[in-house]
Amino acid sequence: LHIGAGNDKVEIGGMDNPIIRNPLTHEPYIPGSSIKGKMRSLMEWKFDKLKSTGGKVCFCGLPECKVCRVFGSANTKSEEAKDRGPTRLIVRDAVLTKEWKEKFRNGNSIVEEKNENSLNRITAEANPRPIERIVPGVEFDFEISYRVIDTGDNGETDKKYFKEVVLESLKLLQDDYL
């Protein structure tokens, strides 16, 4: 797992792609926005939204758009937005489980440096670079909240979309990566 934090400056031999860490505890975490964004992206693929958006994020804002209704839309000014209502899904940051926090605090290494290399396909020039990543098997806890809103249908559409969109996107995420 690698969720990059970027780096203001890179020193020779230094890490140019560190993971995101809590600034107080230095524990790695996964931003809820990264999880939600990946879930949204997977559902846009599943519902074939990328053709109509030219490969961009779907922000049509239409009330019948499952993606915009569940994940939200920047289109908040239209009449359709009033019918759709606010985003239904809230994904909180994923933090280390209690067990893994203890291991981290006891000095167990849960972060590793991996050296990667990209090649220029024309010149074959190598571009080696180190990245930080979480070792396999580390577990995180996270919380998802889903709002069911009555927009004239007693909340039935939101209940249906919980199964069709939220649960399905979590299943797809398990078979994918962040």
Per-region residue spans from a language model:
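RNA-binding basic/glycine-rich loop and surface signature characteristic of RAMP-family CRISPR effectors
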Residues: 1-119, 123-178
